[in-house]
Regions:
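Short, hydrophobic-biased segments on the C-terminal half of alpha helices
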Residues: 46, 64-65
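C-terminal regulatory/oligomerization modules of transcriptional regulators
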Residues: 115-150
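Short, locally clustered residues in the helix-turn-helix/winged-helix DNA-binding domain
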Residues: 7, 35-41, 99, 126
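Charged, amphipathic alpha-helical coiled-coil/dimerization segments
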Residues: 65-123
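N-terminal leader segment of winged-helix/HTH proteins
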Residues: 1-24, 72
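N-terminal helix-turn-helix DNA-binding core of bacterial DNA-binding proteins
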Residues: 15-59
């Protein structure tokens, strides 16, 4: 089925990142956090990491504390109680050795697609996400209603 094929491809893509994390000696959550810092920018908040990765807040907090203890980053209060993530020199080196090569490979893969193919890929992924999101919300809302009224 199309769904089975989509799920197989999705899993294989995820496996590429999990294998990379493992080869670099990083947990999946640390890899995702570093990737997010690379993508969103230094000085981002823990909330930004949670929003970008869908990793639970407690897991992000634990992984960031570990990275802080290992000397890869510091947390800085700039506004209120929000903690901004700042990389140390070791953190910048870690990013250059682990995340940058992955981003480079991703960019290289995208350059193999035409402009139209890139746009179509993004358009279809967004459409698929929106449809899944709508169906999930509807299912969730109907499940709650059934629970209360049955």
């Amino acid at each position: 089925s199309n769904l089975r094929e989509y799920n197989r491809i999705y899993k294989e893509v995820n496996d590429i990142y999990r294998d990379a994390a493992s080869k670099f000696g990083l947990s999946n959550s640390v890899f995702d956090i570093l990737y997010t810092i690379c993508e969103v920018g230094e000085g981002c908040l823990q909330k930004d990491v949670c929003d970008a990765t869908f990793i639970p807040k407690q897991t992000v907090n634990s992984a960031i504390r570990k990275l802080e203890q290992e000397g890869y980053l510091t947390l800085s209060n700039r506004k209120g109680h929000s903690k901004h993530i700042l990389l140390t020199e070791s953190g910048h080196t870690l990013l250059k050795e682990t995340i940058f090569p992955i981003v480079e490979a991703e960019n290289e893969a995208f350059t193999e697609l035409s402009f139209e193919e890139c746009n179509l890929l993004l358009k279809l992924h967004n459409k698929h996400f929106t449809l899944n999101n709508n169906v999930s919300k509807s299912f969730y809302e109907n499940s709650i209603i059934r629970t209360f009224y049955l």
